[in-house]
């Protein structure tokens, strides 16, 4: 496949033959297509916080998976904050309010947020099925009354919340989606394959910055303990073959913190918490040239 060049014409993504086995998919495409090989695909060193922002650029500050552990995070200078989900433990309204208060004290011009699998109350279908599924698994969430969480997103008064939706700020077209492959029945979990692809098909071409909670296949998605890749194949194909954003920010896999590129799109796993839920991974900054006319 071509690297460094936006896709031309209408591209239709279909379910990948290796969709259900991302580790096998990675091996297959690496061997047969060199899809994850240098020089195009490589790690990107973090930008030091004291690096001057280039003229005519916007600085993005990327974080994810803070899990109600924001008190000790040292936030760097920037223009736009991107948080790609799991800002709470369970999505309890009290947690959301605390997070919103923290956002309110940050100086960024725009703060854009999506949900993750831990924001249970943001997933209406999940909440509707919670009692039927396993009442005792999330007792503090199960005890909530519908009026407590029906409009929980409205508590995020200090940010722009995206859920299968987009916003344009400072000329950048930004799209956010919370969905991840099924994992132990948390919020916004969907089966691999067509169910997730249907969500990725909603991402418009022309998106500059994509925010998802989980990673695409092959980019910061390795789980050492399981010796497995866990990224979504359909998300990778959507990003590389159809949407071609300049920046794809995500989290979800705490072990995958860091930045990579495929020669065109920059991929940032901004997970703040480590695998042991310690909020020690620093925010990642990234500068993009301002769109023409912005």
UniProtKB/Swiss-Prot annotation:
**Which Enzyme Commission numbers does its entry carry?**
3.1.-.-
How its function is modulated: the record gives:
Inhibited by nmolar levels of AMP and GMP.
Effect noted on mutating residue 67 to A/R = Loss of phosphodiesterase activity. Disrupts metal cofactor binding
Please list the residues that bind Mn(2+) 1.
65, 67, 86, 254
Where do the annotations place GMP binding?
Answer: 117-118, 225-226, 254-255
Q: In which tissues is it expressed?
A: Expressed in fetal brain (at protein level). detected in fetal and adult brain.
Under the heading Pfam families, the entry gives:
Metallophos (PF00149)
An example molecular function term from Gene Ontology annotations: AMP binding
Q: What does this protein do?
A: Displays low metallophosphoesterase activity (in vitro). May play a role in the development of the nervous system.
Assembly and interaction partners: Homodimer.
User: What is the protein name for this chain?
Assistant: Metallophosphoesterase MPPED2
What organism does the UniProt record list as the source?
A: Rattus norvegicus (Rat)
State which gene encodes it: Mpped2
């Amino acid at each position: 496949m071509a690297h460094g060049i936006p896709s031309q014409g209408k591209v239709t993504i279909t379910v990948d033959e290796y969709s259900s086995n991302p580790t096998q998919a990675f091996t297959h495409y690496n061997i047969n297509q060199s899809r994850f090989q240098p020089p195009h695909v490589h790690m990107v060193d973090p930008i030091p916080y004291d690096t001057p922002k280039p003229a005519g650029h916007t600085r993005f500050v990327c974080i994810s998976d803070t899990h109600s552990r924001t008190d000790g995070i040292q936030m760097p200078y920037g223009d736009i904050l991107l948080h790609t989900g799991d800002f709470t433990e369970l999505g309890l309204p009290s947690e959301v309010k605390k997070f919103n208060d923290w956002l309110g004290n940050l100086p960024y011009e725009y703060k854009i947020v999506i949900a993750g699998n831990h924001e249970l109350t943001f997933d209406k279908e999940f909440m509707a099925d919670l009692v039927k599924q396993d009442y005792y698994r999330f007792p503090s969430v199960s005890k909530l009354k519908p009026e407590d969480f029906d409009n929980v997103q409205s508590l995020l008064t200090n940010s722009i919340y995206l859920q299968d939706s987009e916003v344009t700020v400072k000329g950048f077209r930004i799209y956010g989606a919370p969905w991840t492959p099924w994992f132990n029945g948390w919020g916004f979990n969907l089966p691999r394959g067509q169910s997730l692809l249907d969500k990725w098909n909603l991402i418009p071409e022309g998106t500059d910055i994509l925010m998802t909670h989980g990673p695409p296949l092959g980019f910061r998605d390795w789980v050492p303990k399981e010796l497995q890749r866990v990224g979504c194949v359909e998300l990778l194909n959507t990003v590389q073959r159809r949407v071609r954003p300049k920046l794809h920010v995500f989290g979800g896999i705490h072990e995958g913190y860091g930045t990579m590129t495929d020669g065109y799109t920059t991929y940032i796993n901004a997970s703040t918490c480590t695998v042991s839920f310690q909020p020690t991974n620093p925010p990642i900054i990234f500068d993009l040239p301002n769109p023409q006319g912005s």
